[in-house]
Amino acid sequence: MECQRCPASARNPATVESRKEKFCDECFIKFVSTKQRKQMMKDEYFRNLFKVIYPFEKEGSVSKILLPLSLSDSGSLVMLDIVHDLLLEQTKQHNNRTGFTVDVLTVFTEENVSVIKERMESLINEKMSQLNKISNIFNVHFIDVNEFFNNASEVSTFIIDNENFEIFSKSKSVDDSNILTLKEILGKYCLNNSSRSDLISIIKTQLIKHFAYENGYNAIMWGHSMTKLSEVIISLVVKGKGSQIATFLDSESFDTLNNKPCKYKNLYPMKDLLSVEIESFLQIRNLAQFLINVEETNVKPNCLIARKSLPSLGQQKLVKNMTINEITNKYFQDIQNDYSNIISTVLRTADKLTQPKSSMAKPSQCQICQSKIYTNPSNWLNRITVTSPYPVETTEEKYLFKQWQDSKLGQSHTHYVELLNEIKQGASNSLDVEDGDVKLCYGCLILLNTSIKDKNLVWPKVDTMDITANATNNNKELSQILDQFEINSDGEE
């Protein structure tokens, strides 16, 4: 088989087959890179961000771009590789000048800090140090996921009244004796893997957006492929967060955070690429070595002709043990080689959605995920749900009720009622208007009601957070890597 894009006089052997077309390695790399660069130049705002603007002394001629890099995600790594090549081209064409600088942000946990250190050392040495010898084009930042809790001066305990779905909260100040950690939140409050996955995703997204807001970036480049975006869209619908889809995909408007306007826009440069194409690019460019899950990456579906590989049956989870995100991921991974039109249809349909009309008296944002709230979910659930129990009457019913009260489930319910009454009392005595008017989006309300222990969750107050306080230098060993390769940032000192 020969490449269909090479000149007829010198066709190379085909190594990739995607979208019913055959490519050699070189043509496929060009195909993927062109798809990403086209998105980076999608409108005037982004064109002005990424192109080299003359004169160089003009204020704002060099844009600041934030690139969240996950070393367990192929998309963000491939995106970084293509951006690196674009910057290299600009330095050659414009006398060592570039139109933008890139700040790479990695959010890490205690469990993976050592392997991230190892992989980032290799990545910095191979992909960033060359350009930084010319100019300070790449900056690298690290944030411990626990900074989401450490940098908030106040936390709120949210609880749902299961009689009418009304939400109450109680705020308290944070000091060294009561700082929360991710491990504590996931272990103490989450009842299943789906709730853990949702909270981790919310925390990481909020950390990245706060970092962008506080440091004045012009854009955040997310490494979501077309497949990944479709997965997120379906997951949002399943979780009761379908109203967030239009905002999630919006790359035309400036973002908002805690009802405050931001100076950056969100961009998805990989949205025209399937995840199998990204995995193939990863293998061709030998980028898998930088990921922390190399073995898992090597068995992901791709569109390489000679190196296609699929997970063995022994590696697959049972559906009942999978999170909502994992189920949607499996579905789209299974169909994307043969039915990629389904994936593109999901994304095209979602792109046409607009934000719902709000029925709220004033603009509100969810206290947990920070999404916009368009209608009060508590009122709607209360109208359609019967929550009052049937009274206990017979001797047998009283006996069974007593058994239930003495069980772990009954004791948990007793603890929930006590906590609810305590928080209700605190809310009624509070002079803080915000505490008396707590709002959660429908998805987070359902999460709290069904997947969180005792229907209560302790969560930082977003407007009291300062993410940059400990960014980059919260791990000395990681900072030493940056020093070694002269990849520095202003927030590092």
UniProtKB/Swiss-Prot annotation:
GO terms for cellular component: cytosol. Pathway: tRNA modification; 5-methoxycarbonylmethyl-2-thiouridine-tRNA biosynthesis. Gene3D superfamilies: HUPs (3.40.50.620). Pfam families: CTU2. It is found in: Cytoplasm. The keyword Disulfide bond does not apply. The modification Phosphoserine is found at S489. Disulfide bonds: none annotated. Keywords: Cytoplasm, Phosphoprotein, tRNA processing. Its main location: cytoplasm. One of its GO terms (biological process) is tRNA thio-modification. GO terms for molecular function: nucleotidyltransferase activity; sulfurtransferase activity; tRNA binding. It comes from the Eukaryota. Belongs to the CTU2/NCS2 family. Interacts with NCS6 and URM1. May act by forming a heterodimer with NCS6. Plays a central role in 2-thiolation of mcm(5)S(2)U at tRNA wobble positions of tRNA(Lys), tRNA(Glu) and tRNA(Gln). May act by forming a heterodimer with NCS6 that ligates sulfur from thiocarboxylated URM1 onto the uridine of tRNAs at wobble position. Prior mcm(5) tRNA modification by the elongator complex is required for 2-thiolation. May also be involved in protein urmylation. This is Cytoplasmic tRNA 2-thiolation protein 2. It comes from Saccharomyces cerevisiae (strain RM11-1a) (Baker's yeast). The gene is NCS2.
